[in-house]
Amino acid sequence: MDGDDRRTPLLGGEGGSTRPPSLRRRDSARSLRSTFLSRLPDKVRGGGDPERPAADVDLTRAKGLSQGEKEYYEKQLATLKIFEEVEALCMPGEFESDAEVLELEDKEQKQSESAMKISNYANIILLVFKVYATIKTGSMAIAASTLDSLLDFLAGGILYFTHLTMKSVNIYKYPIGKLRVQPVGIIVFAAIMATLGFQVLIQAIEQLVENKAGEKMTPEQLIWLYSIMLSATVVKLALYIYCRSSGNSIVQAYAKDHYFDVVTNVVGLVAAVLGDKFFWWIDPVGAVLLAVYTIVNWSGTVYENAVTLVGQCAPSDMLQKLTYLAMKHDPRVRRVDTVRAYSFGALYFVEVDIELSEDMRLGEAHSIGESLQDKIEKLPEVERAFVHVDFESTHKPEHRVRSRLPSTEP
């Protein structure tokens, strides 16, 4: 391809056709990658090797790329990487057996529960020490950090209760399980933390308005302050490092809280010391900064988890993965009609419509649809999949979602 021709789709049709690109079933990720690299402009071609995975193409070696061009090529490479992952999943024996999956899930669950218990025990111990530090120093910033630890203890209990609730299974009362409890618990947790921020903000502003300096700390009080706050910071940092590697969303909430505590401890300590040594108002100003940070940080967490409960569409790369998986699933699939994926808690619900031959026997069609459903549900991002089998794709949508929505007419 000419180095200046930027209009030909790199993954599109032959001969610079302006028709929309059509992906053929016989096309493999390797052939698509080779075609992609062969059509790269000269200034980019040095960063690619047809025998290497798409993810290994180094665009940093390409010279003269604008930011927009770089983003475009990165998106194309990401698409090829998705196709390669799907083809790897479709290889015989690539999916783990049910026994292996259960063993892995059991191991991850034990690790998650261990992280939760350690975090809760640490929160209790740190709360006791911070209460003592607050009484000894009388610092507003330290008091804000202590209130944060109190809510850590309460909210940690909520998260752990949420985890235990998810473990109890009753297929008659909750046919699809209780995974939705997870984002609900995180929302409650985050809402409590944001409420703490408002309370601390009000108290700090009141102290600033009163314009009254507190008493200076004694050397003994400073020693207690340094010892407790620095110890708490080190413990919280270690817990953050321990929890952040978990794939469990509840443990991730713990990790975020531990990181938040590291920030509040450091800012609270600095504000308390500077307020004692220099200007008294530094202490309440530090508390105001912590309060604003708390409100913004945890309000964002509330929004992120609330969105997962209202059926937000999956990102385009997820839809591409599902479409490619459905297309590569079986040569008897004539067409992939519809692919939908939307959040329903922490994971996605997936709907796929495929077209088969009108003359195909019911048992054969059922086997194709069921095996595709099994493949999709083994993806780590998917909770449930629904595969609809049809013999044509010109019909109207089966579901009447809009009829349930409020009228937009005034």
From Swiss-Prot:
Which top-rank group of organisms is this from? Answer: Eukaryota
Tell me the keywords, alphabetical order: Ion transport, Membrane, Transmembrane, Transmembrane helix, Transport, Vacuole
Topology of this chain in the membrane: Multi-pass membrane protein
Q: What InterPro entries would the database entry show?
A: Cation_efflux, Cation_efflux_CTD, Cation_efflux_CTD_sf, Cation_efflux_TMD_sf, CDF_Transporter
Instruction: Give the compositionally biased regions (Basic and acidic residues).
Output: 40-58
Q: Which GO terms describe its cellular component?
A: membrane; vacuolar membrane
Transmembrane segment boundaries: 115-135, 141-161, 185-205, 222-242, 259-275, 285-303
Q: Which residues lie toward the Cytoplasmic compartment?
A: 1-114, 162-184, 243-258, 304-410
Q: Which GO terms describe its molecular function?
A: manganese ion transmembrane transporter activity
Q: Report the function annotation for this chain.
A: Involved in sequestration of excess metal in the cytoplasm into vacuoles to maintain metal homeostasis.
Q: Which organism is it from?
A: Oryza sativa subsp. japonica (Rice)
Q: Name one Pfam family in it.
A: ZT_dimer
- Topological domains (Vacuolar): residue ranges? 136-140, 206-221, 276-284
Cell compartments where the protein resides: Vacuole membrane
- Keyword Membrane in the entry? The reply is yes
Keyword flag 4Fe-4S? no
Q: Which family does it belong to?
A: Belongs to the cation diffusion facilitator (CDF) transporter (TC 2.A.4) family. SLC30A subfamily.
State the name under which the record lists this protein: Metal tolerance protein 3
